[in-house]
Structures are given as C-alpha cells and as structure tokens.
Amino acid sequence: EQALSVAKKYHLNLSSSAQELLQQETPKSLNNVTTQITGSVRELCAAAATACWSLGYEPIVLTDQLCCEAREAGSFLGSIVRTHIGQGKKIAFIAGGETVVHLTGKGLGGRNQELALAAAPALSGLNHCCVFSVGSDGTDGPTDAAGGYVDGQTETDLHAVGIDVFLTLADNDAYHALQAVDGLIITGATGTNVNDVAVALVE
C-alpha cells in the first residue's frame, strides 16, 4: 500500500506487472530466514586497528561514523599528524565511515583520493608520517583506484611536476594528481562494501 501511494503521489507510470506485485500483501514474517551481520564499518576499523598494532603502532579509532566533506576530513587528519609527530610514539589514527564530495570541477577522482590529497599540505616537509584512505569495495568514484596515499614528500613532488594541490582539489582531479606521484592505491574489487577507512600514521 505504501509503495502504491508513493507511486500515485509522484504520478509514476508503473507497468502492469509492477502494479500487480505491489498490490500483493507484504509477508508479515519469514520463519525460514536467519539474518546475520558478517561485516560492518565498525569491524573494518577494528581490523585496521589490529593491522596497525601488528606493525607496532598504537591504534586510536577516532570514529566509525565519519560523515563530512572529504577535504575537511583530510585536512583534519593532517592536523592530527602535525599535533602528534615527533613525540617518540608510533600512533595510528583511524576513521571509518563515508565522506562526500561536492563537485566544483570537471576532474577525475573519488572521495578517498580527495581526502588523501587534502591532507598533503599539512604533511608537507614532515618525515615518518602518512595519510591514506580507501574504499572497502576496492573502488573510489568512477576510477580504478580504491583510494589514495600521501606523505611529507607528496606536495613537493606534485610541485615538481607542475601540480598545485589546491587548484587540483578545486577541479576535483585528485586521481591524476596522485597518479603523477604514485599515490594511488589500487586493489581491484574486494567483493564487499562496508564504507571507507582513512588512516593517519605518525612516528
């Protein structure tokens, strides 16, 4: 009934087979069905934390509910790196969720690539740190990359090939910028999708 009322409200022309299907009563219970959650963004962050721990980093999960502009998230992770670098501790800051990109340009990229690239200016000139962000499904935007990686050398390397980070972000062209400095992360399709994970590593 609800689906039919929505179709009527928006004057949707449904096929006769669709109308017939929607007129059937929705089953109230399915006794032979079991639902089990086998993965989530929270588990993704926990797995990332375990991996970082195995590499000697103290993992800190900042959130598994990240939901903001990709550029803002990248800048924020970059600022966290600047705050904690040089303290003699190996720390991994982990953020899971899904950011958004409001398109202002005509470039190529995805939210994870844009997040990573936006962190590059904050990391510029620093040693022993990086930020990377990936989609758990292995794809990021309309590209073959899962995400991107930047470190303290990235912005310098971009300048060396004539690429300005801020102009690139304004054109939403993170893919080509990261490609130029070997900063794309390409995994291929993973067969799952539990949002994205971004990590800032500091020593």
Report residues per predicted region.
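Generic secondary-structure signature for well-ordered alpha-helical cores
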Residues: 1, 5-16, 46-58, 79-86, ...
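Accessory alpha-helical/coil subdomains and C-terminal extensions
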Residues: 1-76
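A short glycine/serine-rich beta->alpha loop
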Residues: 34, 103-108, 182-186
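Catalytic cores of large soluble enzymes that bind and process phosphate-bearing ligands
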Residues: 36-40, 44, 65, 69, ...
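Short, ordered loop/turn segments at secondary-structure junctions
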Residues: 64-66, 97-99, 134-137
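Short glycine/threonine-rich loop-to-helix capping motif typified by GTGT followed
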Residues: 70-81, 101-115, 141-149
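C-terminal structural cap/anchor segments
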Residues: 89-90, 94-130
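Internal helix-turn-beta structural module
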Residues: 117-203
